[in-house]
Structures are given as C-alpha cells and as structure tokens.
Amino acid sequence: MRTLLIRYILWRNDNDQTYYNDNFKKLMLLDELVDDGDVCTLIKNMRMTLSDGPLLDRLNQPVNNIEDAKRMIAISAKVARDIGERSEIRWEESFTILFRMIETYFDDLMIDLYGEK
C-alpha cells in the first residue's frame, strides 16, 4: 500500500508516465471527496514552504475511520498536483505524516478499493 500511494502521489505531482499504474484509476475516484475549490484553502492551512510536500498534520483533521483515510489520500494527491516540481519537494516528511495518519486503515483501504489485501 505504501509503495502504491507513494507512486500515485508522485505521479499526481508531475504526471510522469513511468510512475503510472492501472491501480491509480481507483485512487483517482477518491478525488470526489475533496472539492477543487478547497485545495487552495488546504494549502494555506498547511503553511507550506516552497519545498514542502503535503503536510496533513497541520490541518488538525483526525483520521477516525476509512472515509477519513480516503480523504487524506485525496488531499495529498490534489495538493501534490498543485505544488512545485517533484525534485524540489521534500517528499519523505509528507509521506511519513500521511502513513502515520492512515496506516491503521491500510488493509481496509486495499479491500475497499481493490477487493483484497
């Protein structure tokens, strides 16, 4: 799950086709959980610098269920789409924060999205 999400979020940042995977189609369905108009507000609330990736912990939004976990993935993907170049961003911190927030739901996410762990 970690590798899939890393590749997906990096792909959303720059659409590098070498990162594309057919599993991304299901992850892209999560986009409907976050309005495009909200992305600018979310970025502002994250107080990011030019080299930051999505810093979800700064949103103060708890992850209490699988739907919250899906929303965090969607937020990460949409913020990644709208921020700077991949090579300029410190992704490691962003992924550490995301995974810490949603790791409890990894198995449930895989079953919900793909029908298996």
From Swiss-Prot:
Induction: Expressed in the early phase of the viral replicative cycle. InterPro entries: Orthopox_N1, Poxvirus_Bcl-2-like, Poxvirus_sf. The keyword Ribosomal protein does not apply. GO terms for molecular function: identical protein binding. Belongs to the poxviridae OPG035 family. Bcl-2-like protein which contributes to virulence by preventing host NF-kappa-B activation in response to pro-inflammatory stimuli such as TNF-alpha or IL1B. This is Protein OPG035. Pfam families: Poxv_Bcl-2-like. Keywords: Early protein, Host-virus interaction, Inhibition of host NF-kappa-B by virus, Modulation of host cell apoptosis by virus, Viral immunoevasion. The keyword Hydrolase does not apply. It comes from the Viruses. GO terms for biological process: symbiont-mediated perturbation of host apoptosis; symbiont-mediated perturbation of host defense response; symbiont-mediated suppression of host NF-kappaB cascade. It comes from Vaccinia virus (strain Western Reserve) (VACV).
